[in-house]
Amino acid sequence: MELRQLEHFVAVAEERHFTRAAERVAVSQSGLSASVRALEQELRTPLFSRTTRSVRLTEAGRALLVEAERTLAGVRAAKEAVDAVRGLLRGTLSVGVEQCVAGLRLPRLLAAFHHAHPHMEIRLRQEGTASLVDGVAGGRLDIAFAATVDPAGWRGELVPLAREPMVLLCAPGHRLAASDRAAWAELAGEPFIDFHPDFGPRRAADAAFTAAGVRRTVALEVTDVHSLLELVHEQLGIALVPHHFSRKPEARGLVAVRPEGAGEAYYESAVVLPEARALSPGARALMALLRDDTGS
């Protein structure tokens, strides 16, 4: 007994006419008749009483109709449950990311997600950490990748990604380039190039200088790492950045110097997740791929 046979049987029972039933299930009348006959042969009893003018259910047919309708309803419910999940994954996944987040190969991650869920639209927003945190908390973003932060009032979940030291970048002709280390006190009065205060590396740098008890001057503020590195190349200032910035092609030729003294400067990145609401199905799927990629 096959589901298709039950569908054919129910169509004939409801239409009480083989031609109309065949049109309803989009098969030929001969094909429908053959399907019903095969079902009757399997059950070893007639299901319909046929005349030239009418088609009526037999007692066995009436008994089968109740169970057939129940079976087909269960199959539809199962399909709808799966379709509901697939429907959510056909929606939109809003992802926020700060530039050059450590411990994350976002293009590869999003490519894997797109391959696994090709009908889901990915909306990627590149913003500063503070804005990303607000976006997740307010529901504008499903998930974000940013610097580790703990702003007042934030009650979300942070899943650590990476932790790395921060280094000073300067042009080869700068006075600090003569050594691979520099005391915090030596940095007082130096013009710095840094990100907007909304960005994670800027927050980490500000915290490091506060911890060291050194006041610094941010001469130029940027919103992208490429501009920052170009300005350092042009000797318009130095920069305190996450170590992986120094390995970028645009940083080639710059000198990396490790600050030392009252504590060390570190940059930490994390996945920003909501706490007040459940993760969206898309965000859960992305997190699963991230764990597979990082082995965590």
PLM region spans:
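A short LG(V/I)-centered, amphipathic sequence patch enriched
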Residues: 40-62
